């Protein structure tokens, strides 16, 4: 975090505007650097189900290349014409992970060439990037008891995620065509920028009572995404010969920009300050998570997502109580917080068992 502040004092003692403060700051709000690996033995499921589920119901001629067409051209054309789901089915078909039930253009049912049994699976995820915020601040003091503040924020998102899924098996029987290894890479790059603002006021109603109010606007993001994929399969034919097939589209999917509006928040606070004794404070804030929205709304995926957000999420109220007691050179502080769950109980199944309400306290 880095920043600077310039303070302007009004030399005219009769002017009711006493002070103006202007500042700028940059804060890296989130570091997206993360890396982890998972290893497991799965006795039930193979990655073949991913390609089967995407292919089921799709015509064979919509997920296969034309005669003489390259993998790259077919992958790009299928994505532009039909979309991402068809591309996943195309990868599964071209890599021989799945086969059509019938080899004709009208076929829409598929089977797996991965024999059932036990699977050794490893998953690795590597993330890079950051979320940052550049803020321009202005503060004003009116008379001796009213303070105004304004923040204008520019947000930055840079996120790159690279995943590798590797699966091996020794299932199946000799003389059977089968897939005994799958290596699947996916890369997602997300870039975005956004804008938000905060407006606040603090007033001293007396030497004892202070009151504050803050409005945090929504953050309006414009987000761009790119994806790329790579797939390898190891095959064993009917003569038990092993061969490696590389299905590399060598292409980047660049998607249409979309926008995200996060919820706004209002906050109110009051404090009772007793000189040489301490203080008591109370803060209340409200944020409506159901107002979060993706656009364009004519996109069926975003329309369904917005509907789910508005149904499953709700207002969240947060209450904070604090106190500080002074006793000679000793200072005792304590606080308690209550925050509602963001989930709408009427739309959450009892089997989901979701309760994200928060209660906490601190002493010092």
Residue ranges with predicted function:
Residues 7-364:
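Outer-membrane beta-barrel porins/channels
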């Amino acid at each position: 975090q880095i920043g600077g502040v310039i303070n302007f004092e009004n030399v005219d003692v009769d002017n009711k505007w006493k002070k103006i403060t202007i500042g700028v700051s940059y804060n890296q709000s989130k570091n997206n650097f993360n890396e982890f690996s998972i290893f497991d033995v799965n006795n039930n499921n193979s990655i073949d189900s991913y390609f089967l589920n995407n292919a089921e119901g799709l015509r064979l001629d919509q997920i296969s290349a034309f005669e003489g067409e390259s993998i790259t051209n077919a992958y790009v054309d299928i994505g532009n014409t039909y979309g991402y789901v068809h591309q996943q089915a195309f990868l599964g078909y071209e890599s021989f992970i799945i086969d059509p039930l019938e080899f004709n253009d009208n076929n829409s049912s598929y089977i797996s060439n991965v024999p059932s049994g036990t699977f050794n699976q490893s998953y690795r995820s590597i993330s890079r990037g950051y979320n940052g915020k550049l803020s321009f601040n202005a503060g004003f003091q009116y008379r001796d008891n009213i303070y105004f503040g304004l923040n204008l924020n520019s947000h930055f998102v840079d996120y790159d995620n690279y995943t590798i899924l590797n699966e091996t098996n020794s299932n199946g029987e000799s003389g059977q065509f089968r897939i005994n290894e799958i290596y699947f890479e996916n890369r997602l790059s997300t870039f975005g920028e956004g804008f938000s603002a905060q407006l606040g006021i603090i007033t001293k109603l007396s030497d004892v009572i202070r009151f504050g109010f803050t409005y945090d606007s929504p953050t309006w993001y414009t987000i761009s995404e790119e994806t790329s994929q790579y797939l390898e399969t190891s095959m064993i034919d009917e003569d038990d010969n092993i061969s490696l097939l590389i299905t590399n589209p060598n292409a980047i999917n660049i998607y249409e920009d979309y926008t995200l509006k996060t919820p706004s928040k209002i906050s109110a606070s009051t404090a009772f300050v007793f000189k040489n004794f301490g203080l008591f404070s109370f803060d209340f804030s409200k944020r409506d998570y159901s107002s979060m929205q993706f656009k364009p709304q004519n996109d069926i995926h975003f329309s369904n997502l917005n509907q789910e957000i508005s149904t499953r999420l709700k207002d969240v109220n947060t209450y904070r109580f604090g106190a500080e007691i002074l006793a000679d050179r000793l200072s005792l502080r304590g606080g308690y917080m209550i925050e509602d769950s963001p989930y709408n109980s009427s739309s959450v199944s009892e089997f989901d068992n979701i309760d994200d309400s928060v209660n906490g306290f601190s002493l010092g």
